[in-house]
Design a protein with these regions (language model features):
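Flexible, glycine/threonine-enriched loop-and-boundary segments that flank and lead into catalytic domains
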Residues: 157, 180-191
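Helical (often loop-to-helix) elements that flank the catalytic cores of nucleotide-handling enzymes
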Residues: 109-112, 153-158
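Extended amphipathic alpha-helical segments enriched in small hydrophobics
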Residues: 146-152
Length: 208
């Protein structure tokens, strides 16, 4: 085997393959890990129900995927991961598959409440997991898109407050919007920029 240059102990070659617990004292690593988990931000989009309904890229069964989603959420609870969304409940793909704005909203909220019921059935507390849920809607040219976010937030807040007895944070529906790819046309390509701009304006006026 080739010999390393003088003064090189090989550590630099190994760093990419090492985890923190291999280079730090155990107590230091655990402290840093716990702090990082409470601060890390991001989103998991693993919404199995929209896969079944719209995107059709399922690898595992719905039952197995639900269990996996529940395991992720339970890990977040156990490790006090509060700022990382365990699932992005997605209406965008449902809309791109052909749903109108009202149907998109209905399916997406129904999926969200399905996850709520499943997590509750596993013994999780509503206020421990509801803040880890986020939503993802499509926008289009239909006038209903100008209020889709406000309607979703109102329905979610009422359900969280009156049915599930969730606290103020659980009642907040967090979502983002992407403009619709389905609304763009090759036949009128010069107008696509205008369509996308109007859709973005809808989202802004809807307090996205």
């Amino acid at each position: 085997p080739e010999r390393l240059p003088h003064g090189n102990n090989g550590l630099g070659l190994k760093l990419l393959g090492l985890s923190g617990d291999e280079v730090l004292p155990a107590d230091v690593y655990q402290k840093l890990k716990a702090e990082a988990l409470t601060q890390v931000r991001g989103t998991v989009q693993a919404d199995i129900l929209k896969e079944d309904q719209a995107q059709n890229t399922c690898i595992f069964s719905t039952e197995f995927a639900l269990k996996l989603m529940g395991d992720v959420q339970q890990y977040f609870i156990d490790q006090k991961v509060r700022n990382f969304y365990s699932v992005s409940i997605s209406g965008y793909h449902i809309a791109e598959a052909g749903a109108n704005p009202i149907t998109q909203l209905a399916f997406t909220l129904a999926n969200g409440f399905t996850y709520v019921e499943y997590y509750l059935s596993r013994g999780m507390n509503i206020d421990d997991f509801a803040p880890n849920l986020s939503f993802f809607f499509s926008n289009g040219m239909d006038p209903e898109y100008s209020v889709i976010g406000r309607v979703a937030r109102r329905i979610w807040a009422k359900a969280m407050k009156h049915k599930y007895r969730g606290n103020d944070r659980s009642q907040k529906l967090k979502y983002h919007i992407q403009t619709s790819g389905r609304s763009l046309h090759a036949q009128e390509i010069d107008f696509n920029d205008i369509r996308t701009t109007l859709q973005a304006l809808y989202a802004i006026y809807d307090n996205c």
